[in-house]
Amino acid sequence: MRTFLSSFIILTTFLASLIAAETHTWYFKTGWVDANPDGVYPRKMIGFNDSWPLPTLRVKKGDRVQLYLINGFDNLNTTLHFHGLFVRGANQMDGPEMVTQCPIPPGETYLYNFTVTDQVGTYWYHSHTGGQYGDGMRGVFIIEDDDFPYHYDEEVVLTLSDHYHKYSGDIGPAFLTRFNPTGAEPIPQNFLFNETRNATWKVEPGKTYFVRILNVGGFVSQYLWMEDHEFTIVEIDGVYVEKNTTDLIYITVAQRYGVLITTKNSTDKNYVFMNGVDTTMLDSVPADLQVNGTNYIVYNESSALPDAYDIDSYDDALDDFYLKPLSKQKLMDDADYTITVDVQMNVLNDGINYAFFNNISYKAPKVPTLLTVLSAGEAATNELIYGTNTNSFVLQGGDIVDIVLNNFDTGKHPFHLHGHVFQLIERHEAIGSKESAVTFNVSDHAEWPEYPMIRDTVYVKPHSYMVLRFKADNPVVWFFHCHVDWHLEQGLAVVLIEDPQAIQKNEKITENHKRICEKVGVPWEGNAAANSNDYLDLKGENVQVKRLPTGFTTKGIVALVFSCVAAFLGLFSFSFYGMNDIAHVEDKVARDLDIDLEAENEDEEEAVVLNQNSSSSDSNSKPH
């Protein structure tokens, strides 16, 4: 009887959730929209249905999303990624081009169709093709929670981003060129606060606001602080945390914070809400770049707006490493499988600066990796079929996985893992650029926290390392990459193939997806080289440019030998002909001018003798 009642309750709860769940259907057509986000330079931004900024999408746990993305561009492919969403059982809906799907060509429509399962919180959506989200193809995605654990009166959404006056399609080629061998990232012209500058936020006294803060930029981390107000952090990347109050927040691109802000009871004045740029990420700071943005918390529209509220140091910014999950999830068991990756930036043989994981710069395969899994049969468990330049790792379902990331670069890097949240179990402090990088030592490391911080995007500090831990319980293909868009373009990415046999069992390519692949000219079967006859034959795959040779090459030796021979011949010619011709030249000049050289020489000798006698006489006349 008890078993029957338990089953009945479970069934009733399940049916109730189905009844409560909604299906959200959106039709969005991409296109260029006239805009002037920073109020300085009009340009076109990527909008949906002739509108920009893009709309905020709101759903609840259990709801279904049916988003039809119509490519309205004339000559650009596109895709859409739902950042932070697990999209369980629907990996084709994750979005990264040539990882989980074929790109959508102009004029075609792709249906993103998935159910929002076991997630709540603050997320976003953006193009995962080229630098399109830096051109404006980005928006907020919120999964509302009827059981939100903290009290608040009103919700507010706040986005941060960097802004360029030029299009990403123009900036990218100038960045990835031999004329930029150091890999200096393009510097934004401005930084936006809710897709504008000098924004105002109208508030009421004595209220608690839940503010969802998202950095939807493509490059620079930012700081946030307020005049005479505090942030109480309660959520990070969709994960609830124990309350933590701070005056200063540091937020990298792709990260999200949910904070409570309680307003004052008085309305006699207004206050400043500042955003500041992490200038350590810039190779140089132009004199005209405004690194601090001044925005306003407005209590009284009749009162004057205050001046900027600058601070002397960013040293007191909250370190998210110490945030504890509200769920009290303990440190997972020891890892079953460890992936160690070394981050480096270097120049290849074409003179261009690339980014590397373990000396491999990611190059997209000729068949999306997910479609290789679905078509490979038993070969899907062999990492080789996914290409030598995709940095692919095959994971066993249910394994605890550690990613050890050693950063040999002198800059910070925010890394995002698709399809999962992870525990950050260690992050070493930054090491100076003139010192050697510190790498993780499994036998000598800091004590790991009992309740590690959990999120989906986290940054590694310069010349140091971090260790991430997660459970491989979402069997699909996942991208792990630096979310500085320039670094992704340079190749800083890894592909995780999680339980390929389960993927084959649970996922089938949709007819819509097949059509998209056919229209864009991308095979939907085969290995990384698009070979569907022999999955171990990678001839013709996309590979990185060759490395610069070390030491002398054959061509270099030959060039050096010929250069030396030419130099010796030149010296010999100069010496032989120069010295040999002196006498002949003198004879020729004497004949031309009818000069008697012997008589001239006798006169010169007599003059020398007279000069010597004169000098001796002068010397004797000087006082001693």
Curated annotation (Swiss-Prot):
Residues 1-20 form the signal peptide. GO terms for molecular function: copper ion binding; ferroxidase activity. Residues 46-144, 190-292, 382-499 form the Plastocyanin-like domain. Cu cation 4 binds at residues 413, 482, 487. Cu cation 1 binds at residues 81, 416. It is a single-pass type I membrane protein. The keyword Membrane applies. Belongs to the multicopper oxidase family. This is Iron transport multicopper oxidase FET3.
